[in-house]
Amino acid sequence: LFMYARLGTLARRYDRRHPHFSVRYPDGDGVDDGYFAVCCNTNPYTFIGNTPFDIAPDANLDNGLTMVTVRSLRADRAARIVARAVKGNGALQRDPAIHYRADVDALVVEALGGRPFPHQIDGDFLGETTRVELRHEREVLDLVLPVGHP
């Protein structure tokens, strides 16, 4: 479901030739050429059939957020990115078209040139915006798991 929603967003007259946003972290790191990004707190992101779509191997409920920013949507690079995500084992985070940050407590995504970009949360399209701020609050939720859960 998430994958179909994500692809739907890209198909909606989305400009794949020019970057849409910057991503900034409190330490000053970031990128100014984001086309597409996914922020995760678990991995895999989704499944294609029984195959995990592994974009953030460091993402888990014990760490901060993991931000995966795609810096190019050229057809050849997009195909390589998908293949590496399916391959798993951290292959995607080593791709030169990806900016990867793990264990992040805060980040800001801001439109380039004030041009709004589409965004969604958990597969739900929320419209266009010029700024998204995300924060991770550690240890604010206790999870109860069934006995014998790994």
PLM region spans:
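Long C-terminal subdomains/extensions of small-metabolite kinases
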Residues: 1-150
